[in-house]
């Protein structure tokens, strides 16, 4: 049943061309929005959507009265080399007249339209790939420790040398302790975790370098709205302040260390 729901969720996402919230999909098939988020990441829905769209465009038949086979080949070769003469030769036209043929083909309205269509597809593909890279930098830059661990205070029963402690009325004696718990790997975004290890001192989780990610994002300021630009600047100032307050000059990425409790002898 879970597999069917997972496939159904992807189908809904693709039907809406990705323009639907996790909550809306979750309400439709009866699972939590968090589950949808996990499926979306693990099954790479965005890539699947783009691949399906690209295959659909590739499979779109070109009417016989638009372009013949050699003209279509010329278009494909031309967008790779932008050399009309060589493209004409590779497409099967006579080498002796390839220079004239190539020039004539570029002036053909239908050929020119097909070249523009192919170029647009190529640009869209490169743009999506570039935005995917930027999205990774965004995730690194604004990573929150609470995405990976939960921490706070909780009450537990006090324990003495002889075991759990109780009061005169046989009620458990409680005490407040601090805790840090690592979230399950299936519930977190592992793409920005560079290292996770279990050593003698406890669990260590190292996240990718936030400052480097912010510097990369700064190179693409013109792609972002003003509000997001301010968010980037605020995060850089915050990191700079944290660095200044440290006693050392460490440039290491964020590392979360959860130490083991030492047993008393």
From Swiss-Prot:
Keywords per UniProt: Viral genome packaging, Viral release from host cell
Pfam families named among the record's database cross-references: Phage_terminase, Terminase_2
Transmembrane segments: none
InterPro entries: SPP1-like_terminase (IPR052404), Terminase_Gp1_N_sf (IPR038713), Terminase_ssu (IPR005335), XtmA-like_N (IPR018925)
UniProt keyword annotation of Transferase present: no
Annotated spans, Disordered: 241-265
GO term, biological process aspect, one: chromosome organization
Domain of life according to the entry: Bacteria
PANTHER family: PBSX PHAGE TERMINASE SMALL SUBUNIT, TERMINASE SMALL SUBUNIT-RELATED
Subunit structure: Dimer of a small and a large subunit.
Family, per entry: To B.subtilis YqaS and B.subtilis phage SPP1 terminase small subunit.
Record function comment: Functions as a terminase.
Full protein name: PBSX phage terminase small subunit
Taxonomic source organism: Bacillus subtilis (strain 168)
């Amino acid at each position: 049943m879970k597999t069917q729901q997972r496939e159904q969720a992807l189908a809904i996402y693709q039907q809406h061309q990705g323009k639907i919230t996790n909550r809306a999909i979750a309400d439709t098939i009866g699972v939590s929005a968090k589950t949808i988020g996990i499926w979306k990441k693990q099954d790479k829905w965005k890539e699947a959507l783009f691949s399906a769209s690209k295959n659909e465009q590739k499979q779109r038949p070109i009417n016989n009265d638009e372009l013949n086979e050699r003209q279509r080949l010329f278009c494909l070769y031309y967008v790779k080399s932008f050399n009309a003469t060589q493209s004409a030769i590779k497409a099967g036209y006579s080498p002796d007249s390839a220079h004239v043929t190539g020039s004539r083909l570029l002036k053909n309205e239908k050929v020119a339209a097909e070249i523009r269509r192919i170029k647009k597809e190529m640009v869209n593909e490169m743009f999506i790939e570039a935005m995917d890279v930027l999205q990774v930098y965004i995730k690194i830059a604004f990573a929150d420790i609470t995405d990976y661990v939960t921490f706070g205070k909780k009450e537990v029963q006090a324990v003495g040398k002889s075991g759990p402690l109780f009061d005169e009325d046989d009620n458990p004696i409680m005490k407040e302790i601090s805790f840090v718990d690592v979230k399950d790997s299936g519930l977190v975004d592992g793409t920005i975790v560079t290292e996770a290890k279990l050593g003698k001192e406890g669990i260590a989780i190292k996240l990718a370098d936030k400052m480097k990610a912010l510097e990369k994002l700064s190179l693409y300021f013109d792609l972002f709205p003003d509000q997001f630009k301010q968010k980037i600047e605020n995060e850089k100032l915050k990191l700079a302040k944290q660095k200044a307050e440290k006693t050392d000059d460490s440039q290491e990425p964020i590392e979360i260390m959860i130490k083991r409790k030492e047993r008393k002898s």
